[in-house]
Amino acid sequence: MASIYDFTVKNADGSDFSLKDYEGKVVIIVNTATGCGFTPQYEDLEKLYEKYHDKGLEILDIPCNQFAGQAPGSDEEIHSFCTLHYHTSFPQRKKSDVNGANELPLYAYLKTQQKFKGLGKGLKAKMVGMAYKSKGKVSDNPDDIHWNFTKFLVDRQGNVVARYEPTQSMKDFEEAVKTLMEAK
């Protein structure tokens, strides 16, 4: 059976990054965009990184332009935007697809480990659902990523333990991260 440690992704400079480097760490895997209504979640992610990085938290940031073209810049421009506006200190990887024919193999795996369970209730969830159907859907896989800032949470043993949609509470997500960080 595969684990996240079997995968590589590209760094922004095009070199390979092996997820084996994350063995024994808690990992947040997130597809991001700079022009999205959820982009301010970078602030919450950076706070988590600052709080827990020394205790073994890593963030795998995969910029993605598949959802309404909300990450249009080059890898360098995206990195500059994030460091300037959100003071991000965690590394960003190469902009990549998370759905469809060119999706990262890592994302194909993640979607088998944590299925899509819905966007939740409320106006944001309805808006994201409509936007996905009109501007983001690239396949008929019901477990595809539905928008930017979908987060997968991986425990220290490499198990993909949760999937959080961008419409879900960041407070609930932070509690889940805290619980994993405190687990031995």
Pin down the residues of each PLM region.
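Conserved helix-turn-beta segment immediately C-terminal to the redox Cys motif
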Residues: 25-26, 34-63, 82-86
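Non-catalytic, surface beta->alpha helical segment in thiol-disulfide oxidoreductase systems
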Residues: 161-183
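N-terminal "domain-start" segment that seeds a small globular fold
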Residues: 1-20, 38
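Short loop/turn microsegments at loop-to-beta-strand junctions
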Residues: 4-5, 27, 148-150
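Thiol-based oxidoreductase modules, predominantly thioredoxin-like and allied folds used
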Residues: 53-74, 89-100
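Thiol/selenol-based redox catalytic cores and closely related redox-interacting motifs
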Residues: 81, 87-168
